[in-house]
Amino acid sequence: MAEVKQTEVNEKKAVETKAQRVERLKRSKNAWDHFDEIQQFARDGFDSIPPEWLGTYFRSWGIYTQGDGVGVVGGKNGEGKARPFFMVRIRIPNGLLRTEQVRTIATLAAKHGRGVADITVRQNIQLHWVTIESLPDVLQSLWNVGLTTTGACGDVARNITGCPLAGLDGQEIIDASPLALAIDRELGGNSEFYNLPRKFKISITGCRHWCSYPEINDIGLTATTRQRGGKHEVGFTLRVGGGLSTNPHLAVSLNAFIKPEQVISVVRGVAEIFRASEVLRQSREKARLKFLFLEHGWTAESFLAELQQRIGLSLDPGEREEIPADIHRDHVGVHDQKQPGLVYIGASVLRGRITPQQLHLAADLADRYADGHVRNTVMQNLLIVNVRKESAALVAAELTAAGLPVHASVFARGTIACTGLEFCKLALTETKSFARWLTRELEDRLPAFEEQLKLHITGCPNSCGQHWIADIGIEGKKIKQDGRMVDAYYFCVGGSVGQFASIARPVGYRCSAGTVPEAIERLLEGFNTRREGNENLRQFFNRHTNEELRALLAGSSVGPIERDLAFGPVPHGVEG
């Protein structure tokens, strides 16, 4: 009888979908309560780790299994034991760091990560090559300086992003960083929100430039003002349901004015709506909050009504807000702060990759010439803030000499790259080294090009490189060339956030990775010769047809690749 029951259990598991399996595992255990198991794995070695930890539980700890660098994914259910190493993502709310934290990260990268650290598009820092034996030391060292990896990955509230100039920008409406930290304390590591249907991303900013991209977050809070009873009041506009990946969707604006004291209740309420949405738990590919709007009939009005009922508040109607126009705010360079005599210095960190030596230098400079604070940006750059103005030139020179230029080309400043095939098991193409090579090629080919641009590189359809909001976005794929599979990219153009927010437009063109520089060179040369007046890249792309843009990319008229003309569930990846 026992054998029959076990057979039934095995058969039941065998027919589980991926979503059903993940949901079952999440219901059965909150991994945050089981650090002791991680310690035991460290004692027993990598081969002792069961598949459910490798594929599910480690993620809520901010830890992913690392790919093998050539795209091989081993193990059951695609969870992979291809390499016995981990990526460890450090959660850094609003990108705010103290120098002791920077030094700790640098030391860990050198000691456990083969000298590799990556700044991410959510203001985190990732370590690579971490072994299971090293993992407890890495986590404990981070805890000792007030950092954590908890909730940096997995089906939880991810790192809270915000303006890296919070409290420093003379034009900001409000310093929203205290609220960002409060949201992080409310949701980060909170067992009430351990089991969400999928990742949950939140952005809050008090600046006028929306540099934290509220349009692509599950919750986007942007500061606004109103006049009430002769008084000037500051609050927030609320957007929900933004996200990219294979179904890019810009967040929906709700007709509500959120007072600062209501922010936590509102954020919790949205998270509770998401948590309660069982319909989103049926498919991992359609589990983000945006799918309530895309596929389940929700509207801004119905969402607001549900939110107000859930939190027990009647929110004031929204106010007309000032949406920023075409902007490019990478924070690179030397800029005045609102504090007299102080500046912030933004260093361009090409593709987000930074060395332990560079991190130590940034910490040393911040202690010597400022007040010991460093900040990350969503464009994968690094800021030293509160620098005495008389020391700015010296700090800038030292950063530049160390490979962190303060005055960089538009290509270095505007290029974003995801983790790519080097470490990510989902990636189809290598992105980090490719981004460095591509940037240098474009600098050599177009040394006089000065139009600000966002050039985003992503190694698979999941859009971790955010190619859907770039001026020029390229998505990795494989194509057959001379009888073998090679890295290639397909192009989309004209993505934007702010007043003219739009998803980038696929133009039906792809080429091998080796010919991407000349394709972009032709495209930008066409922009230089054909632009009308002072139009920017977004306006130029909007004015030209896909056929015209393909001709610029290819150097001659070419027909479209139909599968590269649309976003959505169409697999853009591997071609025979």
Enumerate the language-model features and the residues they cover.
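Peripheral terminal and linker regions in Fe-S/redox and tRNA-modifying enzymes
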Residues: 2-576
